[in-house]
Amino acid sequence: MKQSHFFAHLSRLKLINRWPLMRNVLTENVSEHSLQVAMVAHALAAIKNRKFGGNVNAERIALLAMYHDASEVLTGDLPTPVKYFNSQIAQEYKAIEKIAQQKLVDMVPEELRDIFAPLIDEHAYSDEEKSLVKQADALCAYLKCLEELAAGNNEFLLAKTRLEATLEARRSQEMDYFMEVFVPSFHLSLDEISQDSPL
């Protein structure tokens, strides 16, 4: 059997730090971020289905979110101000991401490719799936800002403001629910969030 470097590449996502131009109290890597986005995206899909009459596959949404930044193992994590400096750079970076996604898909053994390609290639996502993953991605970046600010790192003040605008632009009923029910706890200490559920 032919060897594949696919998972060896993906394991290196933990070596790519996010927010590279900003001082961080706690460094976050792409692997950690992807897990959190998967959990939040799954929650958004479940909330949409249970509370607001949605009919999405929450497990698929979680998988899409888990792989949503996989191409960064080949491209690196380009800082947002650079990525969106102008429309030409944004468009070129999208093209680079597409090439990187295809390169990852090509690493998968042929007999498994049809399973992994729809997870890695964002063009295979439906509009609804893409929206949920993007909401979760923005929410997790926002939560990172809250954590950094709670630790006294004002470096993230402007990023928080920018992400509030992004969240408003991507707003949905399931996001409103998540923001109301789950986000306030991110302003609390470990002792405060542990009071209601002693071991």
UniProtKB/Swiss-Prot annotation:
Q: Pfam families in the record, alphabetically? A: YfbR-like
Keyword line: Cytoplasm, Hydrolase, Metal-binding, Nucleotide-binding
Q: Which GO terms describe its molecular function?
A: 5'-deoxynucleotidase activity; metal ion binding; nucleotide binding
Residues covered by the HD domain = 30-142
Binding annotation for a divalent metal cation: 33, 68-69, 137
Protein localization: Cytoplasm
Tagged with keyword Cell cycle: no
Gene3D superfamilies reported in the protein's UniProt record: Hypothetical protein af1432
* EC class name: hydrolase
Q: Which PROSITE patterns match?
A: HD
The record's similarity note reads:
Belongs to the 5DNU family.
Which NCBIfam families does the record cross-reference, listed alphabetically?
A: PRK03826.1 (NF003009)
The free-text function statement in the UniProt record for this protein reads: Catalyzes the strictly specific dephosphorylation of 2'-deoxyribonucleoside 5'-monophosphates.
Q: What is this protein called?
A: 5'-deoxynucleotidase YfbR
